[in-house]
Swiss-Prot record:
Matches recorded under Pfam families: PRA-CH
Protein name, UniProt field: Phosphoribosyl-AMP cyclohydrolase
Enzyme type, top EC level: hydrolase
Gene Ontology biological process terms from the UniProt entry: L-histidine biosynthetic process
EC number: 3.5.4.19
Localisation: Cytoplasm
Family matches, as NCBIfam families: PRK00051.1 (NF000768)
Gene: hisI
Source organism: Frankia alni (strain DSM 45986 / CECT 9034 / ACN14a)
């Protein structure tokens, strides 16, 4: 596993579960509406920068460098809160998104390619028909 040097609080770092590249997913969510905006990747240092600067910072897997959301596009993410999930293998970054979150220009990264989905019904089970 690749773990780059970081100033992240060791108490936080010890709770993180990372992949073999030393990364974990970071879900960006609009703080006031709950809209899921995007998924990025962080390592310990990206999380440290996010927690201490108030700007969402990610690790670019393709470029191999840190990037602060909005530094190039102007579509900034101002951090409102960060939460670690129950397994320690993902973080939820609640932000105030300025402009589109997606590099394609859409508000979020999940609008371009909806998949065909059978919609579930909590009152119906797959095998037995309607629940009683």
């Amino acid at each position: 596993m690749t773990v780059r040097p970081s100033a992240l609080d060791p108490a936080i770092a010890s709770r993180l579960r990372r992949n073999d590249a030393g990364l974990f997913p970071a879900i960006a969510q609009q703080h006031d509406t709950g809209e899921v905006l995007m998924l990025g990747w962080m390592d310990d240092e990206a999380l440290h920068r996010t927690l201490t600067t108030g700007r969402a910072t990610y690790w670019s897997r393709s470029r191999g460098e840190y990037w602060v959301k909005g530094d190039t596009s102007g579509h900034q993410q101002w951090v409102r809160s960060v939460a670690l999930d129950c397994d320690g293998d993902a973080v939820l970054v609640r932000v105030d998104q300025i402009g589109p979150a997606c590099h394609t220009g859409t508000r979020n990264c999940f609008v371009a390619d909806p998949l065909p989905t059978r919609v579930g019904d909590p009152g119906v089970t797959a095998d037995a028909g309607p629940a009683r």
